[in-house]
Amino acid sequence: MFPMVTEFMNYGQQTIRAARYIGQGFMITLSHANRLPVTIQYPYEKLITSERFRGRIHFEFDKCIACEVCVRVCPMDLPVVDWKLETDIRKKRLLNYSIDFGICIFCGNCVEYCPTNCLSMTEEYELSTYDRHELNYNQIALGRLPMSIIDDYTIRTILNLPEIKT
């Protein structure tokens, strides 16, 4: 009979311990109830990207001197620079410039080392397509400035996320 009483007492202690653990978890859940939601409704709400965000590369054709520094510093040897040597003025003339964003790792080396600052990073990050060949941007597509999220009236921008308290 005594073993049965001790088992019943152990069962009671285990029940109290389990209820305490459940209560602790419930208290953590309730402590999060008064916080603002962290999630955003993506297609309709977007976060404003930081100033140093590395998005799609913008290219200014008139500034480029076809020095190919961007090709040399790129870890993927990605930018394709076609140029022709003008013998009368002894300078290179840029014919075509293209970057395949399906291969680009957005490291920013080409932007950092460009001597004429003809390359810059934009805040555009929505580059998905159904055909991977559409990710190969020529100088015309690279020269197009993206629409700013701030200027788009159909999208609600979120400036500050609520800080997570630890």
Curated annotation (Swiss-Prot):
Q: Which cofactor does it need?
A: [4Fe-4S] cluster
Record: residues binding [4Fe-4S] cluster 2: 74, 104, 107, 110
User: What PROSITE patterns does this protein's entry cite?
Assistant: 4FE4S_FER_1 (PS00198), 4FE4S_FER_2 (PS51379)
Q: What topology does it adopt in the membrane?
A: Peripheral membrane protein
Record domain 4Fe-4S ferredoxin-type: where: 55-84, 95-124
Q: What class of enzyme is it?
A: translocase
Instruction: List the molecular function annotations (GO) for this entry.
Output: 4 iron, 4 sulfur cluster binding; iron ion binding; NADH dehydrogenase (ubiquinone) activity; quinone binding
BP terms from Gene Ontology: photosynthesis, light reaction
Oligomer status and interactors:
NDH is composed of at least 16 different subunits, 5 of which are encoded in the nucleus.
Full protein name = NAD(P)H-quinone oxidoreductase subunit I, chloroplastic
From which organism does this entry originate? Steiractinia sodiroi
